[in-house]
């Protein structure tokens, strides 16, 4: 049986990153997303600069203001977050149809079928993170392992913009020394019960019997028993089948020079061909989409008699479609 390879991608301080990308004046500043400092809401996301002051998600905005009075308090812009998230999920689905989004900024990918001797899971994770950075100008952290639990654990170990691989060689050492509060799914209430029963790290959890953990946590006890051993049989639950492969880019400033745009079309044609090649697929339809400075989306597509997969073929069709869009 082929060993599963799962990637967990978690965007770094996603809401705050989007705000800093869309407003460069915020870059490097303590950004706190959620609302005005005087509001009665809670913090959605805080940049790492704000976290140095002790600000964290779900904290009351008033408390965040006390800790970081010079912070930049930003009202959540869910339209921008959803649009960027859709772009990221599209990148995931250009690699595999086995994608399970967990929120706007994180997802599991089962890439077992893509892994080859010359293309390990870690390299695929690097490609995905690179695509996210090039397409959205945002960073993501990744965890790679043989099950979902360990992949999620790994994605949080080297944030921001890091990647960790947990395999059979290092899993025991990682789990045994892990603080119990760092186990995914262990919240404040569970942590208190753990501490009250002498469980402070993975080794303490490992040494408890399944019966003891069920007595303390009910049905969850069996899951905790398995987690201490790195066991998780849950599948990546995908709800969509990928039918397209594509690449998008957003220019830093408005561009109306044909030569510059076509250079980018050539680059994107190459990226798309590269993805098709990795997936050993070809295309029967080519689509070009343009978003204007007024945020109007224009698109044209061409269905083909013979499928294409090369950079040149994709570019030649995209070139025709671009000219049709430019001069309808």
Swiss-Prot record:
Residue ranges constituting the UmuC domain according to the UniProt record: 6-187
Cofactor binding note of this UniProt entry: Binds 2 magnesium ions per subunit.
Sites annotated Substrate discrimination: 15
Binding, Mg(2+): 10, 105
Principal localisation: cytoplasm
Active site residues according to the UniProt entry: 106
Cofactor(s) named in the record: Mg(2+)
GO molecular function, one term: DNA-directed DNA polymerase activity
Keyword Acyltransferase: no
Compartments reported by the entry: Cytoplasm
Top-rank taxon, per record: Bacteria
EC number: 2.7.7.7
InterPro entries reported for this sequence: DNA/RNA_pol_sf, DNA_pol_Y-fam_lit_finger_sf, DNA_pol_Y-fam_little_finger, DNA_polymerase-Y, DNApol_IV, Rev_trsase/Diguanyl_cyclase, UmuC
One GO term describing the cellular component: cytosol
Catalytic activity line of the entry: DNA(n) + a 2'-deoxyribonucleoside 5'-triphosphate = DNA(n+1) + diphosphate
GO biological process, any: error-prone translesion synthesis
Keywords noted in UniProt: Cytoplasm, DNA damage, DNA repair, DNA replication, DNA-binding, DNA-directed DNA polymerase, Magnesium, Metal-binding, Mutator protein, Nucleotidyltransferase, Transferase
Subunit structure and binding partners: Monomer.
The family this protein is said to belong to: Belongs to the DNA polymerase type-Y family.
Matches recorded under NCBIfam families: PRK02406.1, PRK14133.1
Known role: Poorly processive, error-prone DNA polymerase involved in untargeted mutagenesis. Copies undamaged DNA at stalled replication forks, which arise in vivo from mismatched or misaligned primer ends. These misaligned primers can be extended by PolIV. Exhibits no 3'-5' exonuclease (proofreading) activity. May be involved in translesional synthesis, in conjunction with the beta clamp from PolIII.
Listed name of the protein: DNA polymerase IV
Biological source species: Staphylococcus aureus (strain bovine RF122 / ET3-1)
UniProt gene name: dinB
